[in-house]
Each structure stands twice: as structure tokens, then as C-alpha cells.
Amino acid sequence: MAAALMLLALGGYATAQERLTLRIADQKGGMRSQLEAANALQNLPYDIKWAEFPAAAPLAEALNAGAVDAGIIGDAPLLFALANGAPVKAIAVDKSNPAGTAVLVSPGSTLKSGADLKGKRIATGKGSIGHFVALKALEQAGISPKEVQWVFLGPVDAKVALLNGSVDAWATWEPYTTQMVKTNEGQILVSGKGLLPGNTFLAATDSALNDPHKRAALQDYLQRLAGAERWAYANLDSYGKTLGEIIRFPAEIARAQFANRQSQWQPLAEETVAQQQTTADFYLANGLIRTRLDVKPTFDRRFSVPAAEVTP
């Protein structure tokens, strides 16, 4: 009922004034690819201005600067941004299998477990979900973060560094994990399964959330996004081909990495808030944030996801 009333308000805005524009931040092969493949952007009562980013860090910077209204971002980089004062809130969560976030090594590497990372060079993006899984892998092995050499690089440069031996390991995420394994260019040393909650958020700026018309548009956008994701999983072969063309990966790899994620948009629940608090406390313990962050105020739980999208 609340969502319907918000859409009525949005419709009134669209007829009374010039069309509202939502500025949405995305990463290549992310939300836009699903929405377009599923034809879920038909009859929009607002316009979307897309901004594509190569990784979470610059996307978070755009949210912080107010250059976009909303964007999709992993739990770790969102937390990193929030701890640095970004005026944003999570409005929904995309729950997924975290196994594809992993620490990779070369096929011929002498490293056989997380315990072998001591004293090694690990490439990843600072504050990224890859950084998070690397830290969790070290914790599991009883290794201090100070006992490894961090090499902070973007995905493209990190891959090159692993392939040419400049680093010993690469902590990354999908689709890179599946690509490296499928092409025999890398193998998983430590998987994120059992280490990470597997949460990715749709986050919006405070200014967008405080605007009732943009908030209504965001609710509509979320409904379409959840439906598009479900369509993508019901049409894996078709979507895998489309996704492969967008991210310039073979269709087989694009399909496999998406299927492995098992993602599902859900409304924000207490469990998700608790998981994010655990992540925040972990970041504090590892010196990535300076003061303890109470994450509860960083969630806006007014948004709903269709019941059909949530597994009972």
C-alpha cells in the first residue's frame, strides 16, 4: 500500500512538472544489464541517468560527492565510505553466495592454504570486498595484516601483477574469480564461503532519500531491479550471452559466475544489520576505520521488495 501511494505521488510529480531524473551509479555488467535484458525499464515514470564505474571505490566517491542519487555497492566498500562520513544509507540488500569472493593464486603456486600467505604480497583494492576477504583469510590463519605486503591495485592491474609474478596472491570478486579459474590462469586459495555474509547493497544519498519524489522513484526502481534479477536467473543462457557481450567475457564464463552468485534482492532485516555491525567492528579491529561505527542509522528500512523475490 505504501509503495502504491508513493507511485501515485510520483505520477503526480511527473505530470505537474518536468520528468524527474534518477542518477544511478552502476558497475559494468551490473544492474543496468539485468534491467535492459529483462525489458524492465518500460514505461518508466521518471528518467534514469546512468554512471558506470570500474570498481566500488570510485562509485562510493560519487555517492559521497552527491554526483549520483543511488548505486550498487558491496558491504565492505559501503562501510568504508560510511566510516569516512559519506551521507548515504543502504535501502535494500542483494544476498548472494560469497564463494566467488576469494584469494587467488597462480596454478603453479607453492601456496596451498591461507597459512602460507604470511610474508607474501597480496594485490587487492583498498577497502574493497577483496580486501575484506583477504583480511578474513589472514584472521582465520592466525596471521596479522602487518605480516603481509599489501599491493593496492584495481582489478585489471591486479590480474596482470598475479600473472607476471609481481604479487603472490590476488584477493578479488566475480566475475574475475570464475574467469581466472575457468581459463586456468588462477586457482582459489581461500574462498569467501563461511567468511563473508555475501551482502551487496543498493545505497542512496541522504538528499535523494529526503526528497519524497526521488524516494518514490527509488522504490519503483528497486521493484523493477528485483524482478529483473529473477528474470535473469530464469533465463540464464540468454542473460549469460548478453552479460558476456557487456563485460567482454565468454558467454560461458559470464553465465557461470552469475549462476554461482545465487543472488536475491531482499528487504533489510535485523540479521543484515547485525552482519554489517560485525563487519564494522572487524574493520575497526584491523585499523581500516578509526572509531567504532554504529551501523543502525546507516540503514533506511522504509523500502520493500516484492514477497515473491524472497525465499520463505
PLM regions: where:
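Bacterial N-terminal signal peptides
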Residues: 2-9
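Short, glycine-/small- and polar/acidic-enriched structural segments
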Residues: 17-144, 149-152, 168-174, 187-196
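Soluble non-cytosolic domains of exported or imported proteins
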Residues: 29, 54-57, 72, 124, ...
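Secondary-structure end/capping motifs
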Residues: 211-290
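Conserved C-terminal helix/tail region of periplasmic/extracytoplasmic solute-binding proteins
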Residues: 281-312
